[in-house]
Amino acid sequence: MIQQESRLKVADNSGAREILTIKVLGGSGRKFANIGDVIVATVKQATPGGAVKKGDVVKAVIVRTKTGARRSDGSYIKFDDNAAVIIRDDKTPRGTRIFGPVARELREGGYMRIVSLAPEVL
């Protein structure tokens, strides 16, 4: 579960390395986000020459969480880190590559471009 002030690794090549959650989108007073949810975040660490700079406010979709997510068949999926992909307003990623595995729940959320770029979908 990701909440305000949570720091996440960025799993794409948009130029950001780490982001800090400002707000969880989707309803007033919403506290937590899970895989497939959109957050507003600020860039805390960035690589030189990237598309996004340190201090930029961006939207991101969560692709991996340590807490994991429960699936309809009763199983759980958990990852070793908390990671997100920076997106545009039309749900397409800002970067051109995705690093590491992503969860299958992104397919139901309409993030087909992220799913197709990912090296592994679990």
Swiss-Prot record:
Keywords: Ribonucleoprotein, Ribosomal protein, RNA-binding, rRNA-binding
GO MF annotations in UniProt: large ribosomal subunit rRNA binding; structural constituent of ribosome
GO aspect biological process, one term: translation
Keyword Plastid listed: no
Gene Ontology CC terms, in alphabetical order: cytosolic large ribosomal subunit
Listed CDD domains: Ribosomal_uL14
Family: Belongs to the universal ribosomal protein uL14 family.
Subunit structure: Part of the 50S ribosomal subunit. Forms a cluster with proteins L3 and L19. In the 70S ribosome, L14 and L19 interact and together make contacts with the 16S rRNA in bridges B5 and B8.
Function text: Binds to 23S rRNA. Forms part of two intersubunit bridges in the 70S ribosome.
Protein name, entry field: Large ribosomal subunit protein uL14
Species, as recorded: Streptococcus thermophilus (strain ATCC BAA-250 / LMG 18311)
Higher taxonomy: Bacteria, Bacillati, Bacillota, Bacilli, Lactobacillales
